[in-house]
């Protein structure tokens, strides 16, 4: 239970990451906001906590907004969603879904491509992980991660690892 957001993931409905929300939360006229959520930023922050807990159970303690120097000709600090100096790990978390009509969320794929670019620019020696929500398209059952890897493989730097979190089983899906 995350009391600050009044979300209970043990009672989450299948394929609904937000879980139970407070009765005082009302749905505003925001067509691109996740149903039942206070805001999309809350959904992302909650998903980061899920990732932190997953890695902590495996002995990797991560910090939020982990800053690393990245760049091509010059270096500038970039904050990854999660990271650690010992062991050297950086993680980007994405809780994106297929659109309601089972179409590709193309703007979200651009954000994934941006994450790949930052992984490419990150210092050598860091383990690079994209931690994503497992979401299957209703039409053919393809997961969003499988689609991304099939379509954008040319953007994925060597060595990037993918973890696909199934919110129903609360486990990583084998890709």
Language-model segments: which ranges?
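A detector of short terminal or domain-flanking linear segments
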Residues: 1-25
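Acidic-basic catalytic patches of nuclease active cores, encompassing PD-(D/E)XK
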Residues: 30-69
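Alpha-helical scaffolding within the catalytic cores
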Residues: 76-78, 149
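Charged, structured surface patches that assemble and position nucleic-acid processing machinery
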Residues: 38-42, 46-49, 127, 148-175
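Acidic-and-aromatic substrate-binding clefts and catalytic sites of carbohydrate-active enzymes
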Residues: 69-75, 137-140
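Active-site beta-strand-loop-beta-strand hairpin of nuclease catalytic cores
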Residues: 78-95
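Catalytic cores of nucleic-acid endonucleases
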Residues: 93-151
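Short beta-strand or tight-loop elements
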Residues: 3, 64, 78-80
């Amino acid at each position: 239970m995350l009391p600050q957001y009044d979300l209970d993931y043990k009672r989450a409905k299948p394929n609904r990451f937000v879980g139970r929300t407070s009765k005082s939360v009302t749905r505003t006229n925001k067509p691109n906001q996740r149903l039942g959520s206070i805001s999309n930023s809350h959904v992302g922050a909650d998903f980061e906590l899920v990732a932190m807990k997953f890695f902590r159970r495996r002995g990797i303690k991560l910090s939020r907004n982990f800053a690393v120097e990245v760049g091509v000709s010059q270096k500038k600090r970039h904050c990854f969603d999660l990271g650690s100096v010992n062991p050297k790990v950086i993680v980007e978390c994405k809780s994106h879904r297929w659109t309601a009509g089972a179409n590709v969320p193309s703007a979200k794929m651009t954000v994934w491509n941006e994450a790949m670019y930052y992984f490419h620019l990150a210092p050598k020696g860091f383990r690079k992980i994209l931690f994503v929500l497992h979401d299957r398209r209703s039409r053919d059952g393809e997961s969003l991660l499988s689609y991304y890897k099939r379509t954008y493989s040319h953007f994925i730097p060597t060595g990037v690892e993918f973890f696909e979190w199934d919110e129903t089983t609360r486990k990583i899906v084998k890709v």
